[in-house]
Every structure is written in structure tokens, then in C-alpha cells.
Design a protein with these regions (language model features):
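Soluble catalytic regions of large protease machineries
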Residues: 8-13, 19-188
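P-loop NTPase nucleotide-binding/switch module
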Residues: 1-5
């Protein structure tokens, strides 16, 4: 794929957004390994982490931080170019899956400690895991709203972090444009 300067800039800010937010919210267990704007597979760039240990239990704080980091790319695009791109599709999917688990499986929302919908484990012919809907349409709407609220709150949090650390965002994006890949220790 051939990327023009505008695409490179958008991708650099997108990845820098993830990196700055992660550097800000990290509790020391998921430091940034490296950030790159070199395309690989379906991804136009990536921010890679090196876990300090296997994380077996996910705290609410940590999963909110994951959603916040996922939203950092989209928030950086909005701040820098005043628009958003389709580049955040995978981030949005991941954030939605985490938020859905928080609401439906882990009792980490205002809906309380209730499990909504049994996951169907029969995966065949390339179909994804599905959820049996054993609740009313009204409850489904509450679940959707709770998921949306979790993601919206973390997007706003990511945007605030980036606005408060705008010079770090610019420095990291410029470093990515110049070097294409930067080590995590250079993100600050």
C-alpha cells in the first residue's frame, strides 16, 4: 500500500494517541514496547505492549483503562484533524467487546451483578461466539446504553488526557513521522 503524507500524519497521530493515553493510565503492568506506523496485515500502524506478568483477573479500573487506551487513537484524530477516520474500526470493536463483557458477564456496570445472556460455545463454520438473549427488549436497550456510556466516558477521558498532554502527542507523532517506529521508553 502506498501512503501519502496526509495518511501518514493521521496514522502517526492515531498511534501516538494510543501510546500517550496508555503511558498515562498504565499501572506498571502493561508498559508500551513500541509504536509504529509501518502497515502490517490489516493494520495501518500499531502500538505494542509488553505485559509485566500474566493478568489472570481483570479489575474494573484496568479494563476501563483498556477501553480508554483503545479510544486514544480516535480521540487524537479528532483533536489533530478535526475529523475521524475508519482507522479506529478495530479499536471500536475491541472496546465494545470489553464493555459488553463488563456489562453482561462481570457485573461492572450500573445494571448490577447480573449475567445477561448465556454465551453459546458452539463455534462452527467460522461463526463467532454468540449470546442467547434471555432477557426483554427493554433490558437489551439498557444493556446497549450501558455499553455505549462506558465507551463514551472513556473516549472523553482519553480526549482529556490528550488535550492535557498535547505537546507529548505532537512530539510522539512527529517522532513516528520521522522514524516510523519508536520504542516505548520514548513515549512521554
Amino acid at each position: 500500500r502506498v501512503m501519502d503524507d496526509e495518511d501518514r500524519k493521521i496514522i502517526a497521530y492515531h498511534e501516538a494517541g494510543h501510546a500517550i493515553v496508555q503511558a498515562f493510565v498504565d499501572d506498571g503492568l502493561l508498559p508500551i514496547h513500541k509504536v509504529t506506523i509501518i502497515p502490517r496485515g490489516q493494520s495501518l500502524g500499531s502500538t505494542m505492549f509488553t505485559p509485566k506478568k500474566d493478568i489472570l483477573n481483570h479489575s474494573k479500573k484496568r479494563v476501563l483503562n483498556q477501553i480508554c487506551c483503545a479510544m486514544g487513537g480516535r480521540a487524537a484524530e479528532e483533536i489533530e484533524i478535526g475529523d475521524v477516520t475508519s482507522g479506529a474500526a478495530g479499536d471500536i470493536r475491541m472496546a465494545t467487546n470489553i464493555a459488553r463483557s463488563m456489562v453482561c458477564d462481570w457485573g461492572m456496570s450500573d445494571l448490577g451483578m447480573i449475567s445477561f445472556g448465556d454465551k453459546q460455545d458452539q463455534v462452527f463454520l467460522g461463526k463467532e461466539l454468540s449470546r442467547a438473549q434471555n432477557y426483554s427488549e427493554e433490558t437489551a436497550q439498557k444493556i446497549d446504553l450501558a455499553i455505549k456510556n462506558l465507551i463514551d466516558e472513556q473516549f472523553d477521558r482519553a480526549k482529556s488526557i490528550l488535550e492535557e498532554n498535547i505537546s507529548a502527542l505532537h512530539v510522539s507523532a512527529e517522532a513516528l513521522l520521522e522514524h516510523e517506529t519508536i520504542e516505548g521508553k520514548h513515549v512521554h
